[in-house]
């Protein structure tokens, strides 16, 4: 599963504010249109979510799944938040990351995502679904943070 989708956007807010929105998983259904429900199942000792369950409806991909998160961020909010799939019904793999970098007074957010499903699906459709998820997530994140 070497293929992945990547896109970036600049958000008019410091990295710490962007990180706060990304880390507030239970608020995702309020701003991330394809996310219907979220539950934090476990937290790391430092308070970051470790395992999170999502219910997703992204058109071609509908599933309830659990992701395991790694937080490689510094105090100002810059760094990488990455995740990998723990369990799912439809998804076979969902690995991705947000990279937050200072960009003047704002934050450059790069979202990388690779998805694979258990049911047969043409690679082109998988990449299209990834692109829709990535582009929509970045636009919705920007809108939420800048509101």
Where are these regions (language model features)?
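Hydrophobic ligand-binding cavity/cleft-lining segments
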Residues: 1-47, 140
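Amphipathic alpha-helical hairpins
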Residues: 9, 90-93, 132
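Short amphipathic alpha-helical signal-transduction/dimerization elements
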Residues: 26, 130, 134, 138-146
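Hydrophobic-ligand binding "helix-grip"
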Residues: 29-33, 37-44, 55-106, 114-116, ...
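Short, well-structured hydrophobic secondary-structure segments
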Residues: 50-52
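A short acidic/glycine-rich loop-to-helix N-cap element
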Residues: 114-136
